[in-house]
Amino acid sequence: MSDIYQHFRKDERAFIDQALEWKRIVQEQYRMKLTDFLDPREQVILSAVTGQADVGLAFSGGYDRAERKRAILFPEYITPEESDFELQAFNVRYADKFVSVDHRSLLGALMGIGLKRQKFGDIVFSETAVQLIVSADTADFVAAQLTQAGKAAVSLEKIDLSDLNIPAVDVEIRDDTVSSLRLDAVCASMSRQSRQKSQTLVKNGLVKVNWKVVEDPSYIVAEGDMLSIRGFGRCSLTKIEGKTKKDKWRVTFERQK
């Protein structure tokens, strides 16, 4: 069983252990296991860990292109329904003629009321609405406690998932080759700049991997990682497809324009 760790980073071992425990519960107790919200990398790990026929796996974040999703692990004779994911969506109401609400202020407000990041999913911005998705067990607490986001007074209105106003997204998918899976090399490819410049950005704390600042240029990235470079934006490393004859890694990036 310990051999599974060699395929992942050392800092991912705690999550691997958690995933193995979820799997054990399903196998031994013959019941579904619902997780908190997982980021894309955690979804990749969970998919790898549960890769056996006797345990099924399904994800939902409330809409098709959701980034953060809850997972259900289930016995093979059970088929989960959407309601089993226990998601609640909200409209965020505020005086938009006088103040604005952005992703950072709303994220900070949710964390500020003591809500753990695992308890809420995507924050969705469209031309007509700001909406968010939380776990159903925290919905009443969030509705009662979230009254301010930045300088804006806010209130929440419960809505059905079908009423989410998901904007159309123009996605750029780009294939490339990189000499290494080091963070500086991948960031250089992702942002189309020199490796030296990428090293400087990493060392200056301007690069995040899965929402955490990483200042080590030699950090090895993995499939499913979300990379963020300040001033450039975010890209998902969606595929790593082995090496070319010239010993370079084939990678695929996905970026929302």
From Swiss-Prot:
Residues 181-251 form the S4 RNA-binding domain. Keywords: Cytoplasm, Protein biosynthesis, Ribosome biogenesis, RNA-binding, rRNA-binding, tRNA-binding. Residues 1-74 are annotated as: N-terminal domain. It is found in: Cytoplasm. Disulfide bonds: none annotated. Its main location: cytoplasm. GO terms for biological process: rescue of stalled ribosome; ribosomal small subunit biogenesis. InterPro entries: Nucleotide-bd_a/b_plait_sf, RqcP2_N, RqcP2_RBD, S4_RNA-bd, S4_RNA-bd_sf. One of its GO terms (molecular function) is ribosomal large subunit binding. Disruption phenotype: No alteration in cell division. Has a synthetic lethal phenotype when disrupted simultaneously with trans- translation; double ssrA-ylmH deletions grow poorly at 37 and die at 49 degrees Celsius. GO terms for cellular component: cytoplasm; RQC complex; small ribosomal subunit. Residues 87-166 are annotated as: Central region. It holds the Pfam family S4. Has 3 domains, an N-terminal domain (NTD) which contacts helix 69 (H69) of the 23S rRNA, the central region which contains an RNA recognition motif (RRM) and the C-terminal S4 domain which interacts with the P-site tRNA and H69. The NTD and central region are required to complement a double ssrA-ylmH deletion and to bind 50S ribosomal subunits. The ribosome binding site of the S4 domain overlaps that of RqcP. In the presence of chloramphenicol (a translation elongation inhibitor), but not erythromycin or lincomycin, associates with 50S ribosomal subunits with or without a tRNA in the P-site. The S4 domain binds in a similar position to RqcP. Part of the ribosome quality control system (RQC), a ribosome-associated complex that mediates the extraction of incompletely synthesized nascent chains from stalled ribosomes and their subsequent degradation. RqcH recruits Ala-charged tRNA, and with RqcP directs the elongation of stalled nascent chains on 50S ribosomal subunits, leading to non-templated C-terminal alanine extensions (Ala tail). The Ala tail promotes nascent chain degradation. RqcP2 (YlmH) overexpression can compensate for RqcP's role in Ala tailing during RQC, restoring Ala tail addition to peptides in stalled ribosomes. The majority of tagged protein is associated with tRNA-less 50S subunits, suggesting it might also play a role in late stage 50S subunit biogenesis. This is Ribosome-associated protein quality control protein P2.
